[in-house]
Amino acid sequence: MTEFSSFSAPKGVPDYVPPDSAQFVAVRDGLLAAARQAGYSHIELPIFEDTALFARGVGESTDVVSKEMYTFADRGDRSVTLRPEGTAGVVRAVIEHGLDRGALPVKLCYAGPFFRYERPQAGRYRQLQQVGVEAIGVDDPALDAEVIAIADAGFRSLGLDGFRLEITSLGDESCRPQYRELLQEFLFGLDLDEDTRRRAGINPLRVLDDKRPELRAMTASAPVLLDHLSDVAKQHFDTVLAHLDALGVPYVINPRMVRGLDYYTKTAFEFVHDGLGAQSGIGGGGRYDGLMHQLGGQDLSGIGFGLGVDRTVLALRAEGKTAGDSARCDVFGVPLGEAAKLRLAVLAGRLRAAGVRVDLAYGDRGLKGAMRAAARSGARVALVAGDRDIEAGTVAVKDLTTGEQVSVSMDSVVAEVISRLAG
């Protein structure tokens, strides 16, 4: 007899299985709900795209493009990449389908897996789940504040409260070139290794994003972009903060924040949770005023975010909280006989049509085994019937919380169950 080895999920790729999957779904759906309540429409995008889309949009000097992308040649020898982030794909779709020719801003939200080849650790996976929003077509600081407030509301709707919003401005095209020269002058005066010096020549902001402690110490006194904003960029940032104050969204200004993607301009922000240790970011985003034009579309601005579902789940656990209902069903049917099995299946269908989650005991478990299964399911009510009960036209309705049990006529079961679940 041939023996086969078992398989495991690829390294750095998490499974979400019951009961943990219930919390994952609740977090994802809760974050999405906050966007939909603000008028954002759902968009579904390909898992893989033309590699050039990310190279041009995200930036070739970023770690994402240079080190972390899953890129391969397909059977037509075309270079494709598993999406490492969502914004570039959304902008591509907006251009391709002419969404920017209609009413502006275009407001879109999405959820799904993204892929980065990183060293796996708690909260940092090679397949990461995100919820994102993008608002494209209007350069208005009030829209920046709305997007940030949506993320804040999404986290709070889940009961998460141990996070903080860090925010800064990355300036605009009128002040960034001068700051770039100033920063390069500072960096080239340091004793940098060859690779870091090369990156400083391409995009010096990438050096400030380096996580190595020794380099962070060397750049601690680097000039800060917030001190060199143009009048337009400063006014934009001040207005964003004023709107956040009015909306009651607390924030901390972090002048040393650098986002990991090259397309960000003006407003940039990150939500962090100290309960996650080194991987404290649970989401972030910013404005990208040049990305549409850079990818072949109109010269329209945009603002968006990506929120980590995986990390939000971990943040909730760090606070000792859960989201979602881990119960598999509301009602569990226990048929004791073939006639009872058929009748309870019909009742289950009626209850499901009424919006009640119903499961049934299958196989010949006997009463004790079936009731143990009912308890494990998390159901609040059990329906118990043998063939004699079916002949009499009755079903036992048992409250699994109190233990109370009543005999109910077949025609009254649906109403009785709904009444008990509502109580």
From Swiss-Prot:
One Pfam short name: tRNA-synt_His
Keyword field: Aminoacyl-tRNA synthetase, ATP-binding, Cytoplasm, Ligase, Nucleotide-binding, Protein biosynthesis
GO terms (BP aspect): histidyl-tRNA aminoacylation
EC number(s) recorded for this UniProt protein: 6.1.1.21
Catalytic reaction annotation: tRNA(His) + L-histidine + ATP = L-histidyl-tRNA(His) + AMP + diphosphate + H(+)
Main location: cytoplasm
Location(s) in or outside the cell: Cytoplasm
One of the record's GO cellular component terms: cytoplasm
PROSITE patterns linked to this entry: AA_TRNA_LIGASE_II (PS50862)
GO molecular function: ATP binding; histidine-tRNA ligase activity
InterPro entries for the chain: aa-tRNA-synth_II, aa-tRNA-synth_II/BPL/LPL, Anticodon-bd, Anticodon-bd_dom_sf, His-tRNA-ligase, HisRS-like_core, HisRS/HisZ, HisRS_anticodon
The protein's assembly and partners: Homodimer.
Assigned protein family: Belongs to the class-II aminoacyl-tRNA synthetase family.
Protein name as annotated: Histidine--tRNA ligase
Record organism: Mycobacterium tuberculosis (strain ATCC 25618 / H37Rv)
Gene assigned in the entry: hisS
